Regions:
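Alpha-helical transition-metal enzyme core signature, strongest for iron centers
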Residues: 67-75, 97-112, 146-157, 179-190, ...
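Terminal targeting/low-complexity segments that flank the catalytic cores of oxidoreductases
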Residues: 1-92, 113-129, 138-143, 201-204, ...
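Amphipathic alpha-helical segments within well-ordered protein domains
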Residues: 78-82, 95, 161-164, 176-177, ...
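All-alpha helical catalytic cores of prenyl diphosphate-utilizing isoprenoid enzymes
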Residues: 115-132, 137-167, 172
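Soluble, non-transmembrane catalytic domains of enzymes that act on hydrophobic metabolites at membranes
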Residues: 168, 191-196, 200-207
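Short, charged, amphipathic alpha-helical segments
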Residues: 92-96, 174-177, 207-208
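Short helix-loop-helix connector
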Residues: 85-86, 164-168, 180
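Hydrophobic, aromatic-enriched interface-forming segments
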Residues: 172-175, 182
Length: 302
């Protein structure tokens, strides 16, 4: 087997432990179900309705339209995984996630309709639409797991945390606490189950997955670039969003590797190239292009 396609084995957890953890995600989801419509109304009553500066409405809408349609994509993918996955415990985890994503979608839709009344897909950022379609159209379980649990979910968690810390709207901040709690379980699903899928894949399939993942990361950049003005309007540094999302995505991959006893190939090189790509593409920092090239080169050679 070539080094490009090999997944190097280290100490592996007992499969029974993994099964218990996956089944545990299902039971935790059942124990922590919340009624989205009731909770949204409680938040509205608590804070006297949505309370946001008028000049921030469009920026917040731009960001959370991506979250809305990302939740729908996650709902569709997790429901699909629940029928495609053969392992019973993993199927339970996927089923629990589908329930969570359905709730997130309708709650966010209700919130955005209260914010400015527009939630049609025609108003969705075109780069986000392309990225989500890229994952929805994936032709293998590994791509759906990796794309949703290790790319989309960490980015969503990053946006939840940063926007909540800014407290742009107290109602949204309270909603995001509940969203974050659910989404953390979804990342765990990916870190626990993806390694067992990888072990069953052929070398060409693994290489195809790494290439697909890299292309997905590049598509994410277009989303972040397109939102830079919206971030700045809300007082959020675009670079902070990139760095925080990068950290969460890398952490998810490392947890997967450590828990399952594998060494994930190419990740260091992929992150260096990603950092360089960000330096070249961001328009939020006023730097001469030659300085951008220098910084990008430093990232690649780091």
């Amino acid at each position: 087997m070539s080094s490009a396609g090999r997944v190097k084995e280290r100490t592996r957890l007992d499969p029974r432990i993994i099964d218990d953890k996956l089944a545990g995600l299902y039971h935790k989801g059942q124990d922590r179900i919340w009624n989205g419509k009731e909770y949204l109304q409680e938040c509205l009553d608590k804070h006297g309705g949505i309370n946001i500066k008028t000049n921030n409405v469009e920026a917040l809408h731009n960001i959370f339209m991506i979250i809305l349609w990302g939740e729908l994509a996650a709902w569709k993918i997790s429901a699909s995984l629940a029928t495609e996955i053969e392992d019973d415990s993993a199927r339970m985890a996927a089923t629990a996630q589908a329930h969570d994503e359905a709730r997130h979608f309708y709650v966010m839709k209700d919130y955005l309709e209260l914010l400015n009344g527009n939630t049609t897909k025609e108003d969705l950022n075109k780069h986000a639409d392309r990225f989500l379609s890229y994952i929805l159209d994936a032709n293998h379980i590994s791509k759906k797991l990796l794309g949703m649990q290790m790319m989309v979910e960490p980015l969503a968690l990053t946006l939840f945390r940063i926007v909540r810390e800014k407290d742009v709207d107290p109602v949204l901040s309270d909603l995001l606490i509940m969203f974050e709690r659910d989404e953390a379980r979804h990342v765990a699903f990916g870190t626990l189950h993806l390694p067992s899928v990888l072990r069953k894949m052929t070398t060409p399939q693994r290489v195809d997955l790494w290439i697909w993942q890299f292309r997905g990361y590049m598509k994410q950049f277009q989303i972040l670039y397109s939102l830079e003005e919206s971030f700045e309007q809300l007082g959020i540094r675009p670079r902070r969003v990139y760095e925080a999302a990068r950290k969460k995505q890398l952490n998810a991959i490392n947890i997967m590797a450590d828990e399952m006893g594998i060494q994930y190939p190419f990740i260091d090189a992929m992150m260096r190239i990603s950092d360089a790509r960000y330096e070249l593409g961001t328009a939020s920092e006023d730097r001469p292009y030659l300085q951008r090239i220098r910084r990008a080169t430093e990232k690649v050679l780091a």
